[in-house]
Regions:
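Conserved Class I S-adenosyl-L-methionine-dependent methyltransferase catalytic core
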Residues: 2, 6, 14-33, 38-39, ...
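A short acidic, leucine-rich amphipathic alpha-helix
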Residues: 49-53
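Conserved adenosyl
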Residues: 113-248, 253-255
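Short glycine-centered segments of the SAM/dcSAM-binding site in methyltransferase folds
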Residues: 174, 268-269
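A short glycine-rich, Lys/Arg-flanked "PGG" loop and its adjoining helix->strand segment in the class I
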Residues: 254-266
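C-terminal alpha-helical "lid/dimerization" subdomain adjacent to the S-adenosyl-L-methionine
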Residues: 273-326
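Core SAM-dependent methyltransferase catalytic element
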Residues: 329-350
Length: 350
């Protein structure tokens, strides 16, 4: 087969860019954990001053800055020999309470390397890997990365996109957050709507313990957390049942949907927040799809297969989710309420 040299060079250029990104992943964690990004966000600084202020070694910091500058993650002023973050870079790299927490996502990347041997075995055998078997950096990373998205969207756009839900929350609603993890979404809803009662459920005991700590630290008293499976949690007559970035991970998403239908009031709402995906594979072959397929093959699919589930994956798409919730779960109404580049927000009603 003849080789097209121009196409070869084009592919190699892409591969080198990806290799550079991969080599930089651990350095993202370095910048985050050692406070380098936060210090850079304060204004232009030399490598020596950055090292001094962060208690790090200048030679390592200088090399780190070179990597970050080459990747377009920091700015370099050659005339003054100093480094800085643009406002946009600072928002994404140095503001954990902002709308994007990119370093948090790299904790998820870190977890995939901790699980590499298991992933190799899963590919060979078709076995799965329970959520709780992952390194704790996965739980920390998903909390950080998803919390930023919830802070940016949940109160201002996602909940208002649901029919009549905000009014119920303001008056006082009974809410279930199923698969709540560390409780970021549950605490945010409880804090915003003090008349409502929010219960977070998760089958991962360590996550429930952390969620309780987060609620206590936030001083929120109208939220509680219970260790429970998504097909057997207690409670009924909920006004709102929410699934944030988790339904596709479930071992029995149809059973989960049926249980939600039983636990919901007749005029209640189920909100399903899922990774953004189109229904056809070819329409997901883009940068966001690449991230999602990567996470799905190493985290989401194994979690479902560990429980003999259908392995919907993080690119399930609206059509497949409709089959699960409506055909399987018994809901009568289902629609896309809103979306972001990273999420689908789906609404189901009896």
């Amino acid at each position: 087969m003849a080789i097209d040299e121009s196409k070869l060079n084009e592919f190699l250029g892409k591969a080198v860019g990806d290799l550079g990104a991969a080599m930089s992943a651990a350095l993202m964690l370095v910048g985050d954990r050692l406070g380098l990004y936060k210090e850079l966000a304060k204004g232009p600084i030399t490598s020596s001053d950055l090292a001094q202020k962060t208690g790090t070694n200048e030679r390592y910091v200088r090399e780190w800055l070179g990597n970050q500058g080459a990747g377009g993650y920091v700015q370099f002023d050659a005339t003054k020999n100093n480094w800085s973050l643009s406002p946009e870079q600072a928002l994404c790299l140095a503001d954990p309470n902002g709308p994007v927490d990119m370093p948090g996502a790299y904790n998820i990347v870190e977890a995939t390397f901790h699980a590499l041997d298991r992933t190799l075995d899963n590919f060979r055998t078709g076995k799965g890997m329970e959520w709780g078997e992952h390194h704790p950096c996965l739980f920390h990373g998903t909390e950080r990365f998803f919390r930023a998205g919830y802070n940016a969207n949940l109160i201002t756009s996602w909940l208002p996109a649901l029919d009549g839900v905000v009014e119920k929350l303001k008056a006082g609603a009974k809410v279930a957050d199923v698969g709540c993890g560390h409780g970021a979404s549950a605490v945010l809803m409880a804090k915003t709507y003090p008349n409502s009662k929010v219960t977070g459920y998760d089958y991962h005991a360590d996550s429930i313990r952390t969620a309780r700590e987060r609620a206590a630290a936030a001083g929120v008293t109208n939220v509680q957390f219970e260790e429970a499976d998504a097909v057997s949690y207690r409670g009924e007559s909920f006004d709102l049942i929410a699934f944030f970035d988790c339904l596709h991970d479930m071992g029995d998403p149809v059973g989960v949907s049926r249980h939600a239908r039983r636990a919901l009031k007749d005029d209640g709402t189920v909100m399903i927040v899922e990774p953004f995906a189109n229904d056809n594979v070819q329409d997901n072959l883009n940068p966001v799809g690449r991230v999602m397929y990567g996470a799905s093959s190493q985290i989401c699919v194994p979690v479902s297969l560990a429980r003999n589930g259908p392995a919907l994956g993080a690119q399930a798409g609206e059509r497949r989710l409709r089959e699960v919730v409506v055909t399987g779960g018994g809901f009568g109404r289902f629609r896309r309420a809103t979306e972001t580049p990273f999420n689908l927000v789906l609404e189901a009603r009896p």
